[in-house]
């Protein structure tokens, strides 16, 4: 076994950086200066340890080829080996006589697949196994190539069936053994139906498999020198063998790159001093530059980042600096509770991942004799394993968040650096941050409080009701909920481990934090200094922005832009319309029918039951369609989702969890049920927010025209190349949407994953614009850029007009301390109105791209969507627009 040793990085330059230390010491004292730089140093060490752990795990599992450290090596070697395989094929064909055994098996397989399997399998054997004899490695290569040939024919010969029925399920299996076992079952089923030409696979003989592997190793050596052969115990009976080793220069190349990657993979942490202000496109947030200085904008390349270097956007810089200057601290009371209950076997908070795996279902006594019982047990066990995989990942994340909270628990204040994605959405940089899940948000509170006062106490109670899920009713009813549950709240604050009513609420940890503050007001009165962040959340933010920019009164009313005595719940509105259709279909819908299906390849005719809308409606009525069924689909409409996307969401969010929990037994045909519901949601939401759908279609038309290549019809001369889409947000942030087709070609293997092959000839051309992605991405990216601009404008407005210093920000959620909540409530609305009164963002977008169109395209561009009669000033009077 080859050992790949990664040299440890020396990050001492971070902790010992003199310039940031002196700056920090002058402002915050030497102790905090040392601690801050030590934390930044530690972040790099933590990141390195995480990378090394992953690398070592991949080494042991034989998956080192999947690590980024090995991929450049493989990318370099692949073309060389592919060329050698092609040459060998030609050499063999040119010769007379009997052809080599290996050729007979390899000639029907793509050289790219043979080369990749050889390199990946060889690396796996040499870095994970002790038995690295030529025979052992050759046998492994031969078996892997046979598996690709055998099961790859399902993908290639029955592409439609594979894509529709097999691929997704195959990808859910983890590990070669389980993937192969699954494909064997699929193969048997397909053969029984006359697919694959009705021919069963004739397994390769062991000697033939080794012949194939040996020839592949020979070609690997001939073309790349990646490995070398060594004779062991020559002449010793029973011990004479030939081993294979990774060439030292290649082992060193992997180790060197792994070390470099480990050095630029920091696990960023909070700061114990205010973050470094942003003054340029790099170097803000953290005080020492480290190996990888933080970038203001998260882009896919340095070239993309450099576009922002000379952009004048003072309001953007100002907003990010105000946001990250917010002082936070750990909520010790919530932390004390979280430290205990997350270790309980039966945690009262439903969303907390358990410490131990759920027990497998009991095996039926007749499982060995009853195939149906075996199948049912396997299905139930598979659900447990699937849930456990997610549980492990979530548990690791939970324990890291708790570790971070405990680490910073005794600091009077901590801060979180912020930056943006390329659309301008604002993100906290560290892994532990205020934009996390309910527990993470509950563990944090703002560091600077003020006496709560009467108005602040009012908003505190509104916040408490929101955390309990009582947020779809008017404010008086929310207040009433809190007052009626006064005893419960006080009991939870006094003994949260004994009185766990708080754990039953919609956002349990945030509600627990509220309970403690509510009790504080009860004990100390309105002079109580409260620093709990109270959040005002948008009501389906994407549709709010589309409705505002188009003055759409119908859509605006559905998402609470207009004053109303009751809360408009667009998810509930759509669910109601869906239920009306379900009721009608249950009575007058279509009946089930038996449809005949003709196999395109074999001509075999089979029958299957297609559920009618009457049966499907009955299933959904039995399950119960509420806002939770429609929420994700409606929410993602403004971000580009359509009927097909809705189908997958319904399947993943509703049907599959219901089946796993035993509550979805009515869904006898999950895919049909999901498709039916997706269609109803699409129809219902399309008539609810007509203008938003129209705006999205208009944006797609614009992006499609820009991404089109214009040629002279007679000469074929290119008159205009494909263009990226560019626009500027109302606060001056430039957005470039530029999806490109990868220069590489993707190689898909059945069990060894995917790999992108570099072209063998470098054309020195930039890759082309991906027209499909440009079109499908424009609506979500455009509206995300608008809500990012609104957030930044709100931060600056609230800070400069109302003197607010503390902000809790999550895209369309705006929070601050109770004493300042009323002013932030106003600021969010004022900036929304100001933005769309002073900017016609769609007209501005048109102006920014129209000049790039060729004259022949101008008549293809549809007119700007018509505007409605929504009075933007009404937003100022709407209680529930952001509430």
From Swiss-Prot:
It is an enzyme of class 2 (transferase). Transmembrane segments: none annotated. Gene3D superfamilies: 1.10.287.260, 1.10.287.280, 5' to 3' exonuclease, C-terminal subdomain, DNA-directed RNA polymerase, N-terminal domain. The active site is at 537, 631, 812. Pfam families: RNA_pol (PF00940), RPOL_N (PF14700). Monomer. Interacts with T7 lysozyme; this interaction inhibits transcriptional function of T7 RNA polymerase. PANTHER family: DNA-DIRECTED RNA POLYMERASE, MITOCHONDRIAL. Highly processive DNA-dependent RNA polymerase that catalyzes the transcription of class II and class III viral genes. Recognizes a specific promoter sequence and enters first into an 'abortive phase' where very short transcripts are synthesized and released before proceeding to the processive transcription of long RNA chains. Unwinds the double-stranded DNA to expose the coding strand for templating. Participates in the initiation of viral DNA replication presumably by making primers accessible to the DNA polymerase, thus facilitating the DNA opening. This is T7 RNA polymerase. It comes from Escherichia phage T7 (Bacteriophage T7). The lineage of its organism: Viruses, Duplodnaviria, Heunggongvirae, Uroviricota, Caudoviricetes.
